[in-house]
From Swiss-Prot:
Keywords: Cytoplasm, GTP-binding, Hydrolase, Magnesium, Metal-binding, Nucleotide-binding. Residues 364-392 are annotated as: Disordered. This is GTPase Obg. Mg(2+) binds at residues 173, 193.
Length: 392
């Protein structure tokens, strides 16, 4: 199946049903009084994470999703039926962004997690609600509110423990092929990898972790150059970043400048991502004599003023790759589990202030008065039943 990690959809929650103006009429009961019921609430729209899905491709073909409208109220104080909700299944790791406001509406990080993204309209009030000692036959009602309409950008963030980054042709795909069963395309030209790939890595002690191969970055990626931020986002949930540096680039470029380009793009994209633990992997060391490779690596480390973890590998021959995996596994055991901040939790909440509508309604705002005969014109000879005043 084609990997699709972005889609744009429009969700339309159901409108609330209108309240009804109705009066009970019964033989020998001249003035039965109001019995208009409330409408039903409109249906809501939810996103739910499903571990059986791994792409957003379905939402490329169907972009519009509507919840059901609430039914209008009826006579005999009958409340209208609530509109049916709709639930859209998405892969685990999906987040939803409101295109108009840029607000993060939802981020679904676990199977079964369910978040409302559009609230249905509130029900209108029937005329029974307006009965009082001075208004015995009210013809007032309120209309249901409109359901929320949102245009959402769905983004699928790969859930990996380790993310690989580097310039095109640095050897990221070769490394992931060497340490896992993943088989991303490998060739001797830039941008061979056009979509992210995931691989499961086995480490010592019967441990395992997931590694993500991210398409190569170029200068300006944080602003969308090349494959841009579309794939930088996949690093947000990684616990460790592996920065692959080609010590002998085929185009003759400077490895130090290449490394600085990646570092700069990370910092421009997100301070949080740039602050994640990052290890350097010096690749293609088999193209030089061991002493030459060591000297080259030392020069790069000095130029970068790098004091963090670094490894010398030759991914094509798998030299040093298993050592990296074992060290990664041990290192991640020491990392604390990520805990969402209060600010991040607040960003996931969707607040709807619908109670104000009913307060306004009962105070005289948003009220519709139906036309009808005078209150006293009740005919005792009418058949049993009730009269509903309705306006189309």
């Amino acid at each position: 199946m084609k990997f699709v990690d972005e889609a744009t959809i429009k969700v339309d929650a159901g409108d609330g049903g209108n309240g009804t103006v109705s009066f009970w009429r019964e033989k020998f009961v001249a003035k039965g009084g109001p019995d208009g019921g409330d409408g039903g609430d409109g249906g809501d729209v939810y996103l739910e994470a499903d571990e059986n899905l791994n792409t957003l491709i379905d939402y490329r073909f169907n972009r519009f999703y509507d919840a059901e409208r609430g039914k209008n109220g009826g006579g005999t104080n009958s409340t209208g039926r609530r509109g049916e909700d709709i639930t859209l299944k998405v892969p685990v790791g999906t987040r939803a962004i409101d295109i108009d406001t840029g607000e993060k509406v939802a981020e679904l990080m676990a199977h079964g997690m369910k978040i409302m993204v559009a609230k249905g309209g509130w029900h209108g009030l029937g005329n029974t609600r307006f009965k009082s000692s001075v208004n015995r036959a009210p013809r007032q009602k309120t209309m249901g509110t409109k359901g929320e309409v949102r245009e959402l950008r769905l983004e699928l963030l790969l859930l990996a423990d380790v993310g690989m980054l580097g310039l095109p042709n640095a050897g990221k795909s070769t490394f992931i092929r060497a340490v896992s069963a993943a088989k991303p395309k490998v060739a001797d030209y830039p941008f061979t990898t056009l979509i992210p790939s995931l691989g499961v890595v086995r480490a010592r002690g019967n441990k395992s972790f997931v590694i993500a191969d991210i398409p190569g970055l170029i200068e300006g990626a944080a602003e969308g150059a090349g494959l841009g931020v579309r794939f930088l986002k996949h690093l947000e949930r990684c616990r460790v970043l592996l920065h692959v540096i080609d010590i002998l680039p085929i185009d003759g470029s400077d490895p130090v400048q290449n490394a600085l380009t990646i570092i700069d793009e990370l910092e421009r994209y997100s301070e949080k991502v740039a602050g994640k633990p990052r290890w350097l992997l010096f690749n293609k060391t088999d193209l030089l004599l061991e002493a030459e490779a060591d000297e080259k690596i030392a020069e790069i480390l000095e130029a970068l003023a790098w004091e963090g973890a670094h490894f010398k590998i030759a991914a094509v021959s798998r030299t040093g790759t298993q050592e990296v995996c074992n060290e990664l596994s041990d290192f991640m055991d020491t990392l604390p589990k990520e805990i969402m901040t209060d600010e991040e939790k607040a960003a996931l909440k969707v607040d709807f202030m619908w109670d104000d509508y009913h307060k306004d309604a009962m105070s005289g705002k948003n009220v519709v008065t139906e036309d009808g005969d005078d209150d006293d014109d009740w005919d005792d000879e009418e058949d049993d039943g009730h009269v509903i005043y309705a306006r189309d």
